Protein backbone atom coordinates (compact mmCIF):
# COMPACT_ATOMS: atom_id res chain seq x y z
CA UNK A 1 0.00 0.00 0.00
CA UNK A 2 1.46 3.37 -0.97
CA UNK A 3 0.59 6.75 0.41
CA UNK A 4 0.53 9.88 -1.68
CA UNK A 5 2.44 12.85 -0.30
CA UNK A 6 0.92 16.27 -0.54
CA UNK A 7 2.71 18.74 -2.80
CA UNK A 8 4.01 22.01 -1.39
CA UNK A 9 1.06 23.96 -2.81
CA UNK A 10 -1.42 21.41 -1.42
CA UNK A 11 0.16 21.73 2.04
CA UNK A 12 0.15 25.53 1.70
CA UNK A 13 -3.48 25.75 0.61
CA UNK A 14 -4.62 23.37 3.36
CA UNK A 15 -2.71 25.34 6.01
CA UNK A 16 -4.23 28.63 4.86
CA UNK A 17 -7.74 27.15 4.70
CA UNK A 18 -7.48 25.72 8.22
CA UNK A 19 -5.98 28.92 9.67
CA UNK A 20 -8.73 31.02 8.08
CA UNK A 21 -11.24 28.80 9.90
CA UNK A 22 -9.39 29.24 13.21
CA UNK A 23 -8.35 25.58 13.17
CA UNK A 24 -4.64 26.22 13.75
CA UNK A 25 -4.14 23.30 16.14
CA UNK A 26 -5.73 20.96 13.61
CA UNK A 27 -3.36 22.30 10.95
CA UNK A 28 -0.37 21.51 13.16
CA UNK A 29 -1.62 18.00 13.93
CA UNK A 30 -2.37 17.26 10.27
CA UNK A 31 0.37 19.03 8.32
CA UNK A 32 3.46 19.26 10.55
CA UNK A 33 6.28 16.71 10.58
CA UNK A 34 7.00 14.90 13.84
CA UNK A 35 10.39 16.66 13.98
CA UNK A 36 9.21 20.15 12.93
CA UNK A 37 11.45 23.06 13.91
CA UNK A 38 9.70 26.37 14.61
CA UNK A 39 11.68 29.60 15.01
CA UNK A 40 10.27 32.90 16.30
CA UNK A 41 11.78 36.25 15.31
CA UNK A 42 12.28 37.45 18.86
CA UNK A 43 14.70 36.33 21.53
CA UNK A 44 12.06 34.31 23.34
CA UNK A 45 10.97 34.70 26.94
CA UNK A 46 10.81 32.67 30.14
CA UNK A 47 7.27 31.66 29.11
CA UNK A 48 8.03 30.78 25.49
CA UNK A 49 11.33 29.75 23.95
CA UNK A 50 12.41 31.21 20.62
CA UNK A 51 12.69 27.69 19.18
CA UNK A 52 10.31 24.76 19.38
CA UNK A 53 11.44 21.30 18.30
CA UNK A 54 8.84 18.64 17.52
CA UNK A 55 5.10 18.72 16.89
CA UNK A 56 4.23 18.49 20.60
CA UNK A 57 6.41 21.53 21.37
CA UNK A 58 4.76 23.51 18.55
CA UNK A 59 1.31 22.53 19.84
CA UNK A 60 2.36 23.64 23.33
CA UNK A 61 3.56 26.97 21.91
CA UNK A 62 0.17 27.44 20.24
CA UNK A 63 -1.61 26.59 23.48
CA UNK A 64 0.55 29.12 25.35
CA UNK A 65 -0.49 31.76 22.79
CA UNK A 66 -4.19 30.87 23.17
CA UNK A 67 -3.93 30.88 26.98
CA UNK A 68 -2.33 34.33 27.01
CA UNK A 69 -4.18 36.18 24.23
CA UNK A 70 -7.78 36.89 23.32
CA UNK A 71 -7.93 36.95 19.53
CA UNK A 72 -10.52 39.47 18.32
CA UNK A 73 -9.80 38.92 14.63
CA UNK A 74 -7.27 37.29 12.37
CA UNK A 75 -6.52 37.53 8.68
CA UNK A 76 -4.45 35.11 6.64
CA UNK A 77 -3.17 35.96 3.16
CA UNK A 78 -1.23 33.86 0.72
CA UNK A 79 0.18 31.37 0.19
CA UNK A 80 3.06 32.39 -2.01
CA UNK A 81 4.87 29.19 -3.03
CA UNK A 82 8.43 28.74 -4.29
CA UNK A 83 9.89 25.25 -4.79
CA UNK A 84 9.64 23.46 -1.42
CA UNK A 85 8.75 26.62 0.50
CA UNK A 86 5.87 29.05 0.82
CA UNK A 87 5.08 32.26 2.67
CA UNK A 88 1.87 33.13 4.49
CA UNK A 89 1.03 36.48 6.08
CA UNK A 90 -0.82 36.49 9.41
CA UNK A 91 -2.44 39.59 10.93
CA UNK A 92 -4.00 39.56 14.40
CA UNK A 93 -5.97 41.92 16.62
CA UNK A 94 -5.43 40.58 20.14
CA UNK A 95 -5.55 41.44 23.81
CA UNK A 96 -2.70 40.20 25.98
CA UNK A 97 -4.65 38.65 28.88
CA UNK A 98 -2.14 39.25 31.70
CA UNK A 99 -1.70 42.97 30.93
CA UNK A 100 -5.05 43.77 29.31
CA UNK A 101 -3.18 45.54 26.49
CA UNK A 102 -4.84 45.33 23.08
CA UNK A 103 -2.68 45.47 19.97
CA UNK A 104 -2.42 44.38 16.36
CA UNK A 105 0.46 42.39 15.01
CA UNK A 106 1.43 41.22 11.57
CA UNK A 107 3.91 38.52 10.73
CA UNK A 108 5.17 36.70 7.67
CA UNK A 109 5.81 33.00 8.06
CA UNK A 110 8.17 31.00 5.84
CA UNK A 111 7.34 27.29 5.72
CA UNK A 112 9.53 24.52 4.29
CA UNK A 113 7.91 21.27 3.17
CA UNK A 114 9.71 17.91 3.19
CA UNK A 115 8.09 14.57 2.38
CA UNK A 116 4.65 16.19 2.22
CA UNK A 117 4.82 17.74 5.71
CA UNK A 118 5.90 21.11 7.10
CA UNK A 119 9.41 20.45 8.42
CA UNK A 120 10.44 24.02 9.29
CA UNK A 121 8.69 27.31 9.97
CA UNK A 122 10.19 30.71 10.67
CA UNK A 123 8.28 33.83 11.67
CA UNK A 124 9.27 37.38 10.75
CA UNK A 125 7.79 40.41 12.51
CA UNK A 126 8.89 43.72 13.96
CA UNK A 127 9.49 43.84 17.69
PLM features per residue range, with description:
Residues 1-127:
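C-terminal and inter-domain tail/linker signature
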Amino acid sequence: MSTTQLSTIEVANTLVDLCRQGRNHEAIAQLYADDIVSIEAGAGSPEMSREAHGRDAVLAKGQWWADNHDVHSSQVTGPWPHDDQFIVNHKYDVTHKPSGKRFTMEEAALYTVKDGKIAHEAFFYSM
